[in-house]
Amino acid sequence: KKLVDTQGALTGVRNDVALAGLNHKLGWRGTTNTLLNFGEGTFPVGQGGYDGKGSGAVGYLVGQPGKGLQCMFHMMNEARIGVGMAATMLGMAGYYASLDYARNRPQGRPMGVGGKDASQPQVAIIEHADVKRMLLAQKSYCEGALALELYCARLVDEHHTAGGATADDARLLLEVLTPIAKSWPSEW
């Protein structure tokens, strides 16, 4: 929003960057994803700006010329795996809360040879077949997602520490698995 000098101190000069909107997205809802307009003259920069009309946003080169997007994706790939890991952990927390509830919530009577026995005490809902099925499905999704996230973390380590073909194989596999590691746990 405000420009900084070479020492990182605020100059008080407003950069010509304006919020155009918020994107709807999958993943961390608390981390916003925005559309920005640069250099449209909404906040004129200096005496006449960079185009002589007051518009122009100040930006900084990331990486080598023509390689900035590549640098950004390199940084974001591990963050995308982190989003998937966070979604996995939320799913695991939900599973453990569901499991605890199912173990402690009594409802219904046990089935005997002649059907339900009203003289027997109620059983926990974890004893019901449909509740068991739902808990097992929840556990399967969570543990499968965790296995995928841990495998991706291992591939990141191999990509950074292994040499030659092993590092290249890990990188190629990560290119395929990273979008899945983010989206699949976030969706389910």
Residue ranges of each PLM-predicted region?
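Internal glycine-rich alpha/beta core junctions
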Residues: 1-188
